């Protein structure tokens, strides 16, 4: 070994080990019990399908139909009724346009905008008095107040009436939580949950877990719907546990943390992240592929951030650009297993895609991975040179290094005919919808990992760049960048409504990816340092059963 090699000083981070051990390796399937549940689910689906159809046929029932659709979506069973829901909302939009007359305009507005219908917010001006303030009488209707609050998170830039409504509803809901704590603790908790995280920003799977017991406590709940939600949860959990067992065994076989002890061992958390993007059964192959790519990306990210020298990273970046097993020999010894695993994940998925003639999809995912490492390398260059980029310069690179362009493109792989060649090209072009998601990912990550990045000799965060560029305090920079996050959420909504050349089931993947961030970066980087709340979520979704 040369003297130069002996003198290498590596800024090694010390990450906590996995909290899960081997508990997900084994999955025992009860086929007979599962078949019995599946039969019950089929019958319940038909019952609910008839409810949707009968409500659609009677105009006076359209308000109740929206309530039914809202419950179906929040209970996590909308994937059974995608066609029926789309037809129902198309009918309602066609019949009423922006002139909804069925009551509860807040629910109408939120449900239609969630589904991609760009309905006007002018209807909320009717809730104001002659002085332009929201009527005080609204505060006596707690559910109406909550519905209005939730609707405000589907606003876009320039919708002042919804901005005012958010301030109004938040103020009064905060007051109500205190008075309701003793008289109606369930409703009080429901309101507190909404104030902490509105539906728009909630992870659908966790919302189902939260909403099922709440819905069951409502006096006039639909019993068939509730039973379907519970049985559906059991079936989904069984599938997800089976998938997690498969990817856990794959990760165990690789044993990459033995060769690379400096990396994060986060297979389970990676699967949870992928589960947030899509939980439906038809996306099983796509979900497992995304989880594997996510896990390997974390290993690569840690190598750029916490271990590799500048020269080594240049070699690795070049090897990824060439994307060939022949490049292994050019790599430092410790990087070879990582590169082999990266190649292996994509080769394995290619075999699956070949069966359906969809192998072309992989080329887009590979291109996005190449781009990601190029941006990792640019950040490594900045860190190596001690360079502090401007906020604009930083974000032009770091929104890509957030990984969300790569994850967006990669999550489409394996979705079959639902995603076309045009959808992949759209994602790689970094359209406003994807860029908004990336900005949210980057800034939320920067808020919670600013201190850790400094300790790892990483490039400074966007917070640091803003502080230096404008000579402001950390608190001021945080407030400015938090506003950027809220602006990005509104951009996300606007693009989901106006981007008509991409189907909603594709755009919803980007929205779901963004919603995962509210869990993973809540208070800290929960992926790196797994917190109790995330552990609770994973246990609830993948370990604990659902009582019928």
Curated annotation (Swiss-Prot):
It catalyses: (2E,6E)-farnesyl diphosphate = guaia-4,6-diene + diphosphate. One of its GO terms (cellular component) is cytoplasm. Highly expressed in glandular trichomes. Expressed in leaves and stems. Mg(2+) 3 binds at residue 453. The keyword Magnesium applies. It is found in: Cytoplasm. Mg(2+) 2 binds at residues 301, 305. Its cofactor is Mg(2+). Binds 3 Mg(2+) ions per subunit. Pathway: Secondary metabolite biosynthesis; terpenoid biosynthesis. GO terms for biological process: diterpenoid biosynthetic process; terpene biosynthetic process. It holds the Pfam family Terpene_synth_C. Its EC number is 4.2.3.179. A motif (DDXXD motif) lies at residues 301-305. Keywords: Cytoplasm, Lyase, Magnesium, Metal-binding. GO terms for molecular function: magnesium ion binding; terpene synthase activity. (2E,6E)-farnesyl diphosphate binds at residues 264, 301, 305, 442. Mg(2+) 1 binds at residues 301, 305. The Asp-Asp-Xaa-Xaa-Asp/Glu (DDXXD/E) motif is important for the catalytic activity, presumably through binding to Mg(2+). Monomer. Sesquiterpene synthase involved in the biosynthesis of volatile compounds. Mediates the conversion of (2E,6E)-farnesyl diphosphate (FPP) into guaia-4,6-diene. Belongs to the terpene synthase family. Tpsa subfamily. This is Sesquiterpene synthase TPS2. It comes from Xanthium strumarium.
């Amino acid at each position: 070994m040369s003297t130069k090699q002996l003198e290498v000083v590596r800024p090694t981070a010390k990450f906590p080990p996995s909290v899960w051990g081997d508990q997900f390796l084994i999955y025992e399937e009860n086929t007979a019990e599962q078949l019995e549940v599946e039969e019950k689910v089929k019958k319940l689906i038909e019952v609910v399908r008839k409810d949707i159809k009968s409500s659609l046929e009677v105009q006076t029932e359209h308000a109740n139909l929206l309530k039914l659709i809202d419950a179906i979506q929040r209970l996590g069973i909308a994937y059974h009724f995608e066609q029926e829901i789309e037809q129902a909302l198309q009918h309602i939009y066609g019949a009423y346009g922006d002139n909804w007359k069925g009551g509860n305009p807040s629910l109408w507005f939120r449900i239609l905008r969630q589904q991609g219908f760009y309905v006007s917010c002018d209807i909320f001006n009717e809730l104001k008095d002659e002085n332009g303030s929201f009527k005080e009488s609204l505060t006596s209707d707690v559910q109406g107040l909550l519905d209005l609050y939730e609707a405000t998170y589907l606003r876009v830039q320039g919708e002042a009436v919804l901005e005012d409504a958010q301030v109004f509803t938040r103020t009064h809901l905060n007051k109500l939580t205190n008075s309701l704590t003793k008289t109606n603790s369930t409703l009080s908790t429901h309101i507190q949950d909404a104030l902490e995280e509105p539906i728009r920003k909630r992870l659908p799977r966790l919302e189902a877990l939260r909403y099922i017991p709440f819905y069951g406590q409502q006096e006039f709940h639909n019993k068939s719907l509730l039973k379907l939600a519970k049985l559906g949860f059991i079936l989904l959990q069984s599938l997800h546990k089976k998938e997690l067992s498969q990817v856990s065994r794959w990760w165990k076989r690789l044993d990459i943390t033995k060769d690379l002890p400096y990396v994060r061992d986060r297979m389970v958390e990676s699967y949870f992240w992928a589960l947030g993007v899509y939980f439906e059964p038809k996306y099983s192959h796509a979900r497992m592929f995304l989880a594997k790519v996510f896990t390997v990306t974390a290993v690569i990210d840690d190598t750029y951030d916490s271990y590799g020298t500048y020269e080594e990273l240049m070699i690795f970046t070049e090897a990824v650009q060439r994307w060939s097993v022949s490049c292994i020999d050019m790599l430092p010894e410790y990087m070879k297993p990582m590169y082999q695993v990266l190649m292996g994940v994509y080769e394995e998925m290619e075999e699956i895609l070949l069966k359906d003639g969809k192998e072309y999809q992989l080329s887009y995912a590979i291109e996005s991975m190449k781009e990601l490492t190029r941006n990792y390398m640019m950040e490594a260059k900045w860190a190596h040179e001690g360079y502090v980029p401007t906020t604009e310069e930083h974000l032009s690179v770091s929104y890509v290094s957030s990984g969300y362009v790569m994850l967006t493109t990669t999550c489409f792989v394996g979705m079959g005919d639902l995603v076309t060649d045009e959808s992949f090209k759209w994602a790689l072009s970094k359209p406003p919808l994807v860029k908004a998601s990336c900005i949210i990912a980057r800034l939320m990550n920067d808020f919670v990992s600013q201190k850790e990045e400094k300790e790892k000799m990483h490039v400074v965060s966007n917070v640091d760049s803003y502080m230096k560029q404008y000579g402001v305090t950390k608190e001021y920079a945080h407030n400015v960048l938090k506003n950027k996050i809220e602006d990005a959420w509104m951009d996300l909504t606007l693009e989901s409504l106006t981007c008509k050349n991409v189907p909603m089931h594709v755009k919803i993947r980007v929205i779901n990816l963004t919603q995962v961030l509210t869990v993973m970066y809540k208070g800290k980087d929960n992926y790196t340092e797994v917190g109790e709340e995330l552990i609770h979520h994973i246990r609830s979704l993948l370990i604990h059963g659902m009582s019928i």
